[in-house]
A protein has these predicted regions:
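Flexible, compositionally biased loop and terminal segments
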Residues: 1-193
Length: 193
């Protein structure tokens, strides 16, 4: 995160655990959840970054969900890098949750079926994503040598550039980060044009 701050990045999303990962055996999942809770607590205690949980918190164990909410509350007044902490996150789930939220909001307001149909568009759905109000990512760095998105920020990454790195996350070095930034800087972003 310090590396991101050094070059002026304002929003970072760290994907720590997918919704698919929640199906892992308890003996694998529980230690991961404790590491995530400790990591989020450590990030919040620094009071250096704004912690923003991203994911289906209702699918997480209570202790993990509470750790994420507490980190968000602890850093609410911090002025600095926004760190989206994606835990219990799946891109498809996010889009479904956004559409449900949008429909519930307009149903509660008494909107007709025709009115509901007219507001199902890119802008209105984006306003209900977990990352609402944030810019879409310019660059997505995927560690571990895997060359797939695995459902990461499906909606938001429509025009993102991707960089795949062989290093696993714990071994990801500053030189790896700078290579990704350099590769991104050399690209000609066309946004579909």
């Amino acid at each position: 995160l310090d590396w991101c701050e050094e070059i002026g990045i304002e929003v970072v999303t760290l994907w720590l655990l997918s919704t698919d990962n929640l199906a892992r055996p308890k003996n694998e999942l529980d230690p991961l959840l404790r590491i995530i809770e400790d990591t989020v607590c450590d990030l919040a205690d620094k009071k250096k970054w704004v912690i923003h949980p991203v994911g289906a918190l209702n699918m997480l164990p209570e202790a993990t969900s509470q750790a994420l909410v507490k980190a968000q509350e602890t850093t609410a007044d911090v002025k600095g890098l926004i760190v989206n902490v994606a835990v219990g996150y799946g891109g498809r789930r996010e889009v479904v949750d956004a559409v449900k939220s949008l429909l519930q909001e307009h149903h509660a307001a008494g909107s007709s079926l025709e009115e509901l149909a007219s507001i199902i568009d890119i802008e209105h759905i984006a306003d209900h994503l977990y990352t609402k109000g944030q810019p879409d990512p310019d660059l997505v760095i995927r560690t571990s040598g895997e060359q797939r998105l695995s459902g990461f920020l499906l909606w938001q990454s429509a025009h993102s550039e991707f960089y795949f790195c062989e290093a696993y996350w714990p071994n990801f070095r500053k030189v790896d980060f700078l290579r990704a930034i350099r590769a991104f800087g050399a690209r000609n972003r066309r946004y579909g044009v």
